[in-house]
């Protein structure tokens, strides 16, 4: 079924296809048409951050930005689902066109720019979902918010999503919001994390519930930059790390149509770079902070390699677009 749908969608503009798919999933997730993507996957539980995940394969943030299709992705058999990135206020994102396929490398370039309907809308969608599994909510800052006021945006989102999330991911690594990646380094990172951890403690008392905070990092990091980040993670006591976001590197797609488009590159061409960061990160953290691996996970082999590198949980996005829901089952069955 997916192969037929994909053949049609790949004749259309990439963002139009994305929007069509989200709307279709939204309309079918609660009726018999969900048979098109619903599948049974055996449980392979993983304990992580004190939470039981029914299997280690999750949906990465960015596909269901507004949490409109949670039950559809649950029907596909994901072990956990991450929605967002969401910002305090709704925003349109960057100018179109802003999403491009590079089929030769099963890759996608996007410069969406955190387009979303705002955190209040997302929370309402989460409340309406029937899903009772592990839900991550990925939060960001509005484009118009200055870097030195970024913490306020993250705190607004954290307070609003806290009661509804299994974990919260702080996105400081998208390349499509000007200045955002500057928050990954030095004092800026430490101050951001300290502010978030302080509010987490307040919210834990208020809601009588501890919700872990994870940081999503970029793959485009020098070893010294990664060392600095690890120091901040250990000093502040961050709960977990998601590695990695999309890359600005184009070495693996040179000469392909759309290769020089601005934005973050994801897909199979990211496999080696993300694998390297996860391996290095897990070595440096030495088990003190757990890691979720994402980026170019397009096969059972890639999934196993990421898990063996030290990330017991993994996420997929681009490979799901190219291969369909069967990929989830193939990975889980192989583990």
Curated annotation (Swiss-Prot):
Keywords: Cell membrane, Flavoprotein, FMN, Membrane, Oxidoreductase, Pyrimidine biosynthesis. This is Dihydroorotate dehydrogenase (quinone). The active site is at 174 (nucleophile). FMN binds at residues 61-65, 85, 138, 171, 216, 244, 267, 296, 317-318. InterPro entries: Aldolase_TIM, DHO_dehydrogenase, Dihydroorotate_DH_1_2, Dihydroorotate_DH_2, Dihydroorotate_DH_cat, Dihydroorotate_DH_CS. Binds 1 FMN per subunit. It holds the Pfam family DHO_dh. Monomer. It comes from Pseudoalteromonas atlantica (strain T6c / ATCC BAA-1087). HAMAP family: DHO_dh_type2. Belongs to the dihydroorotate dehydrogenase family. Type 2 subfamily. It is a peripheral membrane protein. GO terms for molecular function: dihydroorotate dehydrogenase (quinone) activity.
């Amino acid at each position: 079924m997916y192969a037929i749908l994909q053949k049609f969608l790949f004749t259309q503009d990439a963002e139009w296809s994305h929007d069509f798919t989200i709307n279709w999933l939204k309309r079918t997730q609660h009726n018999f048409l969900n048979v098109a993507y619903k599948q049974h996957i055996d449980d392979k539980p993983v304990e992580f951050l004190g939470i039981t995940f029914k299997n280690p394969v999750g949906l990465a943030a960015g596909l269901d930005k507004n949490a409109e299709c949670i039950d559809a992705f649950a029907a596909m058999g994901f072990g956990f689902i991450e929605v967002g990135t969401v910002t305090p206020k709704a925003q349109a994102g960057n100018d179109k066109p802003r999403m491009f396929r590079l089929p030769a490398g099963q890759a996608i370039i996007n410069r969406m720019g955190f387009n979303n309907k705002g955190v209040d809308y997302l929370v309402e969608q989460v409340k309406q979902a029937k899903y009772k599994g592990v839900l991550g909510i990925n939060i960001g800052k509005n484009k118009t918010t200055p870097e030195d006021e970024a913490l306020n945006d993250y705190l607004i989102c954290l307070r609003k999503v806290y009661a509804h999330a299994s974990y919260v991911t702080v996105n400081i690594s998208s390349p499509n919001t000007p200045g955002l990646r500057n928050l990954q380094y030095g004092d800026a990172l430490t101050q951001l994390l300290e502010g978030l951890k302080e509010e987490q403690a307040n919210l834990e008392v208020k809601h009588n519930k501890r919700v872990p905070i994870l940081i999503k990092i970029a793959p485009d990091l020098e070893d010294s930059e990664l060392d600095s980040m690890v120091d901040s993670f250990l000093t502040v006591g961050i709960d977990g790390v998601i590695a990695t976001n999309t890359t600005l590197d184009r070495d693996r797609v040179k000469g392909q149509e759309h290769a020089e488009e601005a934005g973050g590159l994801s897909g199979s061409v990211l496999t080696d770079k993300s694998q390297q960061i996860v391996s290095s990160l897990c070595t440096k953290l030495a088990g003190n902070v757990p890691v979720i691996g994402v980026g170019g996970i397009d096969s059972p082999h890639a999934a196993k390699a990421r898990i063996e590198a030290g990330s017991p949980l993994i996420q997929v996005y681009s490979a799901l677009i190219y291969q369909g829901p069967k990929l989830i089952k193939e990975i889980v069955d192989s583990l």
